[in-house]
C-alpha cells in the first residue's frame, strides 16, 4: 500500500508538534465527530487499554515500554479511510548507516510481518504499518500497535551498536 501525501503530512505534523511545544502549551483538540473515521479510531484507542493523547484532529500518540528502547512513542495519523501507525527508531542525528547495519536491517525486514522499516523524508529511521478502514477491528488495531512497537524495539536493538551521538 502506498502512503498518500496527506497521510505522510499528518504524521510529520504530529512529530513536529512534539518538538515545538510542551504538553502544557498544547490546546486540547476537539473531540471527534460521531460517525466519522476519526471517531472510530478513537474508539479503538479506548478499547486498546493503552493511554493515548490526541494531538489534533486525526493525530494521536501513545507511549509503550520497550525492552531495547526505554519508551516507544507510537504515532498515529488517520486519513479519510486509512490509518498509519509508526515509531521513530533512530533520529537522523544519531543514525549511522553502514553496509553492515543496512544488511542487518534488511534481514530484520524479512523477518517482520505487516510492518516496514524505512527512512522517512526527515532521514529518521522509522517503522510503520498502514491499515485501511475495511480491515480495522478493535483486535486488529491493538495487534498492529503491538506489532509496530515490537518492530521498533527490535530495530533499535539492531541499530544500537551503530548509533552516533549528536
Give the positions of each predicted feature:
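Positively charged n-region of N-terminal signal peptides that target proteins for export
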Residues: 1-5
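Bacterial N-terminal signal peptides
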Residues: 9-18
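Cleaved targeting-peptide boundary
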Residues: 19-35
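Soluble non-cytosolic domains of exported or imported proteins
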Residues: 31-39, 95-96, 135-142, 146
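Ser/Thr-rich, low-complexity intrinsically disordered terminal regions
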Residues: 39-93
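Short, internal acidic amphipathic alpha-helical interface segments
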Residues: 84-124
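A short, solvent-exposed beta-edge/loop patch
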Residues: 109, 114-156
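Short, highly charged C-terminal tails/helix-capping segments
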Residues: 160-166
